[in-house]
């Protein structure tokens, strides 16, 4: 049977060798092996070429019909399979928390909440964080890890061990040929920075989610949940994540729920992108050196390791916006401009990861940063296996949250804040798109139009000088030279315009790309909160109608309260880093603009002084 795939999203070809896709279109695959996140196939119009692997779902068997409600005995792992189906799932893990149905204990301790998790049972809509592609990150053995990457090692080889040719510290952005037009796409559609990122198939939902949908698929942000790790959240100064089954918490502050700060903050540099080879030079890849400040021990990672980490984090965290990685590309992977652009994107990504109070302390992230993979591959594999077999995922994420017992939130106020943030993200997304378009167009004009126009002016001045040189009078020589120098000055100013976007506009567009990824994550996070509020309203109505006990309705409201704390904490963190990042970037932009115009002024002043001696 010929390999086929179904397009999950529309894709418009932009480069030679690519083909366009339409959503739901069925394609024929030339090979199931992806090439750096791209597949080759033939679309329904007979065009053959490359397209992103993340945009399609491989069809391996006839699509199943709607699953019948199998009752309590049915495998829970099929509760959240989307209409198009997933790849075959691993066996469902055993129930991790038998006491989930126990009632809430006294306010002094945290008990696992019972069934009836407050979430509506709407149909599942695969999202960017859930369906980053039909090619999903491996959850299986280390052999799967190796086979998926076509690599004899699960870690990046240290520089010098394989191949050579370290790249210098590339601070420049993309060249004039591709810098202005080839920026990150800015759209809240799921084609943002997709690359070949795959989020693994979700594990079996816990009791928190099983009661809600009565066999219907649930929104991915509830069922496709992720463990938090050692981080914490607080209501003002009062909500934290817990390692065990309860921790002391402090009272709420003036800003509402906030993530508790990381007690051991750190940063991580990404340097020395190095081209390496394997299989006697048949395969090449780029390795990056990471140096966390809290260990000062360098580790080397490939992009596929970042890709794997992203998939684990996207699986762990339901109400945390995991920043998107810079996108992949199949061609030009070893060009200096692309390596520089990707490195800058990874630096922004790492900055947001290290500054997030929860993500920064996550075990899998710390393993990624600190495991000396080149000298202890066994430890790397053990940490990888531990992350992939972690049972604290799905709705079990909320079991790791501890909120102040007396800090119940006003659900109407919560709903108002969520609605306000939803409007904010929509407006910010539109504004980011507009600014990105304007910056792209302005950069293009500087690189091509402004440079050309200034050089035309310079050429005209030199033509005038050459005409004046026909006069052989001695007193005319100084003027001729001054006018020629003026022409050269305008040529130099044109070059300054062509080089300037790398210094000011490109960094702004890089920041917009990162935040556009965040904005693409929030609809799912908001959807979880909205569903929880809807479930609370339904439970209250059922109590009034005598269809539900008051105790059960109170439990639903308590669990909605937990979701509200987490959601508002993430929203608050987003605003904090937004203010920090855009303040810093706007300062940098204006400083670079000032430096640029000072250079232009200096060129003009030098030309002006040439006339003093005429």
Swiss-Prot record:
Gene name as annotated: Snx18
Gene Ontology BP annotations: cell division; endocytosis; mitotic cell cycle; positive regulation of autophagosome assembly; positive regulation of GTPase activity; protein transport
SMART domains: PX, SH3
Taxonomic superkingdom: Eukaryota
CDD domains registered for this protein in UniProt: BAR_SNX18 (cd07670), PX_SNX18 (cd07286), SH3_SNX18 (cd11897)
GO MF, any single term: phosphatidylinositol binding
Listed GO CC annotations: cytoplasmic side of plasma membrane; growth cone; neuronal cell body; recycling endosome membrane
PX domain: residues covered: 266-376
Domain BAR per the UniProt entry, residue ranges: 411-614
Keywords tagged on the record: Cell cycle, Cell division, Cell membrane, Cytoplasmic vesicle, Endocytosis, Endosome, Lipid-binding, Membrane, Mitosis, Protein transport, SH3 domain, Transport
Protein name: Sorting nexin-18
Places the protein is found: Endomembrane system; Endosome membrane; Recycling endosome membrane; Cell membrane
Pfam families attached to this UniProt entry: BAR_3_WASP_bdg, PX, SH3_9
Similarity comment text for this entry: Belongs to the sorting nexin family.
Domain SH3: 1-61
Species lineage: Eukaryota, Metazoa, Chordata, Craniata, Vertebrata
Bias type Pro residues, positions: 90-101
PANTHER family (alphabetical): SORTING NEXIN (PTHR45827), SORTING NEXIN-18 (PTHR45827:SF4)
Membrane-related topology note: Peripheral membrane protein
Acidic residues bias: start-end ranges: 141-151
Function: Involved in endocytosis and intracellular vesicle trafficking, both during interphase and at the end of mitosis. Required for efficient progress through mitosis and cytokinesis. Required for normal formation of the cleavage furrow at the end of mitosis. Plays a role in endocytosis via clathrin-coated pits, but also clathrin-independent, actin-dependent fluid-phase endocytosis. Plays a role in macropinocytosis. Binds to membranes enriched in phosphatidylinositol 4,5-bisphosphate and promotes membrane tubulation. Stimulates the GTPase activity of DNM2.
């Amino acid at each position: 049977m010929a390999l086929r795939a179904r397009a999950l999203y529309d894709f418009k070809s932009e480069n030679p060798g690519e083909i366009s896709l339409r959503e739901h279109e069925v394609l024929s695959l030339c090979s199931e092996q992806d090439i750096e996140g791209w597949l080759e196939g033939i679309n329904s119009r007979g065009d053959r070429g490359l397209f992103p692997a993340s945009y399609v779902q491989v069809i391996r068997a006839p699509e199943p019909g709607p699953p019948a409600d199998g009752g309590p005995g049915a495998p829970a792992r099929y509760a959240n399979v989307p209409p198009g189906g997933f790849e075959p799932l691993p066996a469902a893990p055993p129930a991790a928390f038998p006491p989930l149905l126990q009632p809430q204990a006294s306010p002094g301790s945290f008990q696992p909440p019972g069934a009836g998790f407050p979430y509506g049972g709407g149909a599942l809509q695969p999202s960017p964080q859930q369906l980053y592609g039909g090619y999903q990150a491996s959850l299986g053995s280390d052999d799967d890890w190796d086979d998926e990457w076509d690599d004899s090692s699960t870690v990046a080889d240290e520089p010098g061990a394989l191949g050579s040719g370290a790249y210098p510290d590339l601070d420049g952005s993309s060249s004039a040929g591709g810098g202005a037009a080839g920026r990150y796409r800015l759209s809240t559609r799921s084609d943002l920075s997709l690359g070949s990122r795959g989020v693994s198939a979700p594990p079996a939902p816990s009791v928190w989610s099983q009661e809600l949908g009565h066999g219907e698929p649930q929104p991915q942000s509830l069922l496709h949940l992720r463990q938090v790790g050692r981080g914490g959240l607080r209501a003002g100064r009062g909500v934290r994540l817990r390692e065990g089954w309860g921790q002391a918490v402090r009272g709420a502050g003036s800003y509402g729920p906030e993530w508790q700060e990381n007690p051991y903050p750190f940063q991580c540099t990404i340097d020395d992108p190095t081209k390496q080879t394997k299989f006697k030079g048949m395969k090449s890849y780029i390795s990056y050196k990471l140096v966390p400040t809290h260990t000062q021990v360098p580790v080397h990672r490939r992009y596929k390791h970042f890709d794997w980490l992203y998939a684990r984090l996207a699986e762990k965290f339901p109400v945390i916006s995991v920043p998107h990685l810079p996108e992949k590309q199949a061609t030009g992977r070893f060009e200096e401009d692309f390596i520089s652009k990707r490195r800058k994107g990874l630096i922004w990504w790492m900055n947001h990861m290290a500054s997030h109070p929860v993500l920064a302390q996550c075990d899998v992230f710390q393993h990624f940063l600190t495991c000396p993979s080149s000298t202890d591959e066994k430890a790397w594999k053990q940490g990888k296996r531990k992350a992939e077999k972690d049972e604290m995922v799905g709705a079990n994420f909320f079991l790791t949250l501890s909120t102040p017992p007396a800090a119940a939130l006003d659900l109407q106020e919560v709903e108002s804040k969520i609605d306000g943030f939803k409007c904010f993200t929509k407006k910010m997304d539109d504004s980011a798109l507009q600014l990105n378009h304007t910056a792209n167009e302005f950069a293009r004009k500087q690189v091509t139009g402004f440079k050309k126009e200034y050089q035309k002016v310079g050429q005209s001045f030199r033509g005038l000088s050459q005409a004046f040189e026909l006069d052989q009078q001695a007193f005319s020589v100084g003027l001729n030279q001054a006018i020629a120098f003026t022409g050269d000055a305008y040529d130099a100013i044109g070059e300054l315009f062509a080089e300037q976007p790398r210094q000011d506009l490109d960094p702004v567009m890089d920041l917009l790309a990162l935040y556009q990824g965040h904005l693409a994550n929030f609809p799912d996070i908001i959807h979880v909160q909205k569903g929880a509020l809807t479930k609370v309203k339904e439970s209250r109505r059922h109590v009034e109608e005598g269809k539900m006990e008051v105790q059960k309705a109170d439990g639903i409201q308590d669990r909605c309260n937990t979701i509200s704390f987490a959601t508002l904490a993430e929203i608050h963190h987003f605003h904090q880093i937004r203010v920090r990042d855009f303040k810093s970037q706007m300062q940098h932009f204006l400083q670079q603009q000032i430096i640029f115009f000072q250079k232009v002024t200096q060129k003009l002043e030098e030309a002006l002084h040439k006339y003093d001696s005429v």
